[in-house]
Structure formats: C-alpha cells, structure tokens
C-alpha cells in the first residue's frame, strides 16, 4: 500500500528535506533530530501534493516556532500565485492534521520573524507555535 501511495503521490521525486526545512536562517538545514516530535508532521508536509510537483513551501524553525513560507518567481500570473498559495495551504493542512493526530500542542499565529535572510521570492504565510 505504501509503495502504491508513494507512486501515486510521486514521492520519489519530492524535494529533499534539507531543501525545504531550515533552522534559524535559510542557510542552515533543519535536521530531523532538530525537528524532534515535529519530524512526522514536517514529513507529511513534504509529501503533500502540489501543482507540477513544485513543492513551493519552505519552513523555518526558530526556537519553539515553525514559520511557513511559499516561494514563487516574481512576474508569475495572479492565477499561478493563487495556485502556489493553495498548494501551500494543502501542505499546511497535512502538517496540522498530523500534529492533531499525534496530539502535539500548539497554535497558528501571524508573526513573521525578522532578520532571517529571507531568500528572493519567498513570502511569509503563517507560524506554528509549539507548547
């Protein structure tokens, strides 16, 4: 069953963990060890479907907080931007549903961090605070 799901979701062509998840800045990849109890929710986010398998989301862990971003090139059409944001929303849902299933405590809050060396074309969405 897992093999069938991975094929259907094109999981073997998903971006690597180190290109999606970061620790304190966008130059330092987040390790699964650093993610701790949030390894599985982040993995479910990584495996979430996206248009053309682009996986436009990025996550930055800072302290007890996970900041979520969406990436897209400047100059894309409004429709393409909306699709990227919908993809990120679906991925966030995968993250949140896994958090709930695991019984992890936390909450979403709009608090964009400053001074994190935000890469070009990377746009803040929301943050998840762990408890």
Predicted stretch roles:
Residues 1-131:
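Acidic, surface-exposed loops and disordered segments
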